Each structure stands twice: as structure tokens, then as C-alpha cells.
Amino acid sequence: MSLLITSLAWGALLDPEVSSASKVALLDAVLEASTLLLRQNGSVRKFLALVAVLCLAEKTGSDNLPALILGSISTAASLSLHLETALRKSCVSNDQAVQTKRAMWILYCIDKSYALRWQTFSLVGDGSLPTTNPPDTALPSEVATTLSLEWLRIRSQYSKICSNILQLGVGAEGEPSENRSNRAVVLSAALEEWYGSVEISQMMLSLEHSDAVHMKLQTSYHYYEARFQLLSISLPDPRSSSPTGSQECREVLRRSIREVITGSNTITSEYLLQDCNHLFIQTLALSMLALDILLESDQGCGKENRALLSIVAGFFARVDIILPQSSIFEEVSNLIEILTYR
């Protein structure tokens, strides 16, 4: 039942003809079903259903996401799904075994992204996975396409970078700054290589224009979120003097902020409703911009920063029209006024 409700909610989310009230009602139904699902005894069917709900929760920014991650991990651990033999024993068919392996990788990816975003401990390690890489075989019994399998492989590569960034952040305090900087440079290069990879380019070329734009936005917000985290680790305490290296980091940070904010005009209202991560990365960029303006106390809000703040105001004005019940536009407007006229 939970899979059926989740499928209906996904369909409603992707269909612009469905009313907002219907979408909210279906998402509420998914939340209620997931609460009941978490109370059930552990089984492969429960695990697959939890991961399906987890994917939807990540897109919609559900407050239930941490509970779903923990519930999925607990279910997988109780069935020893990280072990090939135990996984196959728990599954009723080869097709279900492949789906379960794939679901383990999806859980891994979502866990890493969540941990990176909120700077918490990741709960799914590489040793928790039954295979070295995600299964890349589409099954006759499912609708999954080659592109969706390719995207899982691409995201799994990104998640491994996230894992390394998390490890760098955890060890940052007691580690010599030079060692930390060197590791950050290596990870930054790996992130750039991932973002400009042939696999992503080929996938874009195989998509229709609207789908390619959507996929480009999706890879972009993953890329910039990891980039912001890396730069935050690399930058010294704002109260300390800024050596040449940190000044270079600040320039990269400003360029990243500019790229994210100026790219907001390519995010359609439809995309905003389908994926709340677009809203998060714009909010993160605004926060970074605000901090940069406040740290440059002697220069005030320059011409370029005022232009960026105007773009931000336009973006969140659109959000206010799409989500009239939200107070975010008023809050952003107050912040922009403070930054502009302080």
C-alpha cells in the first residue's frame, strides 16, 4: 500500500495539472503510510518500500527524512543486506535481489548527501554495501531505464566524494592546516572531474532538451553544495588575518555564489515544486553572500552584490507566488534590506 501511495504522490508531483491541494494531500498520506511502515517487522519488501519513500522525502524536503534514513538502515542491518549471501537468502527472486542491491546504493547516496548538508555523521559506510558498484543491469520486470541506472552510478561517484569531504571536516580541527589544505585541493579536483565527466556529458546529450536542463540543474546543486562545504573547510576563521591562500579561496567562493544566484533564472516554477533542493542551494548561496558582505565591513554592499541581491529578491518573489503560505520571501526581503542599507 505504501508503494502505491508513494507512486501516486510521485505522479502528482510531476504533473503540473494536479492541484497543489491534491499534491499536499498525497504527500500527507505518504507521511502517514511511512510512519506505519516504520513500525512493521523487518523484511526486504519493507526495505524497498522505505527507500522508495526516502527518495520522495529527499525531493520534497520532508522533516521525516532522518527517521526514514535511520529506519532504512535499521531494516537493512537486521536483514544483513550488506552480505551477498544474506541478501540473496532474504530475497524471493533474482530480480528482487538486484532491486535490493540498487536500493542499498540509493540509501548510501541519500545518507551521504544528508550528512554533508547538515554536517552530521554518515551512518552508511562503504562496508555496508553488498557490491563495489551499483548494479547496472535493467530488469525485464521493471520500468527502470538505462538513464536512471546511469544516474545512480554517477551519483554514487559523487557520494564517495561527499564521504571524503565529511572525513576531512571531522579531522579538520586537530590536523595541520597544510595537510588539510592539500587534502581539500585533491577533493576539489575530484569534484571538478566528476562535474565535468564524460558520463554526465553523454547522459545530457541523450536527453530531450527539457530533461537535459532539469538534469543539469540537479547535477549543479549537488556540485555547488559540495563546493561550498569544501570552501568552508578551507577558509580560516574570519576573525584571523587572511593569507594569500585564503584570499584565493574567498575569490572561488564569491565566484561560486555568483554562478548559483545568476543561474536561478533557469529554474522553472515546475522544477521548484518537484525538487526542494533548488530552493535550498539558493538559500545557501544567499547565506554565503550575506556573510561575505558582512565580513567586508569597510566596503559596504558594492554594485555587484546589490545586483546579486536583486536577483535573489526576484527568485524568492517567484517562490512566494508558487508557495503563498510560506513566509520565506518576507524574511529574505528583510535580510536584503539590512545588507543593502546597513
UniProtKB/Swiss-Prot annotation:
Positions of disulphide bridges: none
Induction: Expression is up-regulated more than 10 fold in toxin producing cultures.
Keywords linked to the UniProt accession: Signal, Virulence
First and last residue of the signal peptide: 1-20
Pathway annotation: Mycotoxin biosynthesis
Role of this protein: Part of the gene clusters that mediate the biosynthesis of AM-toxins, host-selective toxins (HSTs) causing Alternaria blotch on apple, a worldwide distributed disease. AM-toxins are cyclic depsipeptides containing the 3 residues 2-hydroxy-isovaleric acid (2-HIV), dehydroalanine, L-alanine which are common for all 3 AM-toxins I to III. The fourth precursor is L-alpha-amino-methoxyphenyl-valeric acid (L-Amv) for AM-toxin I, L-alpha-amino-phenyl-valeric acid (L-Apv) for AM-toxin II, and L-alpha-amino-hydroxyphenyl-valeric acid (L-Ahv) for AM-toxin III.
Miscellaneous remark of the record: Gene clusters encoding host-selective toxins (HSTs) are localized on conditionally dispensable chromosomes (CDCs), also called supernumerary chromosomes, where they are present in multiple copies. The CDCs are not essential for saprophytic growth but controls host-selective pathogenicity.
Protein name as catalogued: AM-toxin biosynthesis protein 12
Protein's gene: AMT12
